[in-house]
Amino acid sequence: MADKEAAFDDAVEERVINEEYKIWKKNTPFLYDLVMTHALEWPSLTAQWLPDVTRPEGKDFSIHRLVLGTHTSDEQNHLVIASVQLPNDDAQFDASHYDSEKGEFGGFGSVSGKIEIEIKINHEGEVNRARYMPQNPCIIATKTPSSDVLVFDYTKHPSKPDPSGECNPDLRLRGHQKEGYGLSWNPNLSGHLLSASDDHTICLWDISAVPKEGKVVDAKTIFTGHTAVVEDVSWHLLHESLFGSVADDQKLMIWDTRSNNTSKPSHSVDAHTAEVNCLSFNPYSEFILATGSADKTVALWDLRNLKLKLHSFESHKDEIFQVQWSPHNETILASSGTDRRLNVWDLSKIGEEQSPEDAEDGPPELLFIHGGHTAKISDFSWNPNEPWVICSVSEDNIMQVWQMAENIYNDEDPEGSVDPEGQGS
């Protein structure tokens, strides 16, 4: 009987999701300046824009690149580099360019040819997460279903993978006992990589160390303060020796690599009432960070007083798995997860007065809800070169590159502005 009920619930949910998606699609011309939807051959659990841009002469677009991965059923997995053509500001943009058949608009007839897979490198198992090294973006670290962290220099691999499926990383980083997701390169110390694991530990490697036989590098330090699965780890963006970690023990920990005690963080705080899945340091404000949790909230923290949670962002209907500050705006951050929504928040609007109708849609700091995904969002990335452009990937193979309409984040023009809550959500 329970099976029947579950099947009925699933069918109802699917219908609701489809209805919401239809509403979203109908409203996209008013809500977005850009929407590109691309179905990948396999779902990607990871997404990160590379920092370089090519601007071909005489064209109305620029070429950006993304690091992606695959999560196949039983076939060969790959680390993937894709290119994306984004229209320049002077490209033709208006709602009349909307193509309802293809579900995209904005100076583009179709996405075909605008998003291309450039490089595929054989990978052992699915790519849980892939992140490039800031000092040399050709170097990419990946988290695998095994305990190894792999490092690839993609310039040393053919763009078409060896059909044998052999995975040939340039380094294998050892130290974990289990798989995981968290991965962070030190922006201030070249080659220093942190990784979080289901084995309750955080490993630190220096990839400039001389590898042992088989291109293996052992962890330089293993941090053992958490008592459960460590979900995410992130270096501080200014202080080369500080990093943060979050775990299923509901804690946020701040560590200092200069300390000799690798089992005790410099700060530990009970951050949420459920597992903490992600964290992000603010790129403009050295004391501010955010954490996202299975308790459906994003929490805002100040390193100078971690006893006090600055704010709790509430609107998600389910677990949050990714949170990222905007690289261009100090007060903007985004979060995503199981509820198929990517929410963009604006700290500067916290506490603003709202009409009762607006309050029904969410708190004043909820700037935008991206409702284009019909499955759990696995990862997303803010484009470092084009403000307000985000790439998000979901479990149903869909990758979307999108930018909310300018009148939503530019308050200057109250005339003709669109209510940002028209999303199907």
UniProtKB/Swiss-Prot annotation:
> What subcellular locations does the record give?
Nucleus; Chromosome, Telomere
N6-acetyllysine sites (modified residues): K4, K160
Positions of crosslink type Glycyl lysine isopeptide (Lys-Gly) (interchain with G-Cter in ubiquitin): K4
Molecular function GO terms recorded:
histone binding; histone deacetylase binding; RNA polymerase II cis-regulatory region sequence-specific DNA binding
Q: Does the keyword Transferase apply?
A: no
List of residues that carry Phosphoserine = S110, S355
Q: Which UniProt keywords apply?
A: Acetylation, Cell cycle, Chaperone, Chromatin regulator, Chromosome, DNA damage, DNA repair, DNA replication, Isopeptide bond, Nucleus, Phosphoprotein, Repeat, Repressor, Telomere, Transcription, Transcription regulation, Ubl conjugation, WD repeat
Q: What is one Gene Ontology biological process annotated in the Swiss-Prot or TrEMBL record? A: brain development
Found, by tissue, as follows: Expressed in neuroblastoma cells.
Name this protein carries in UniProt = Histone-binding protein RBBP4
Q: Tell me the lineage of the source organism.
A: Eukaryota, Metazoa, Chordata, Craniata, Vertebrata
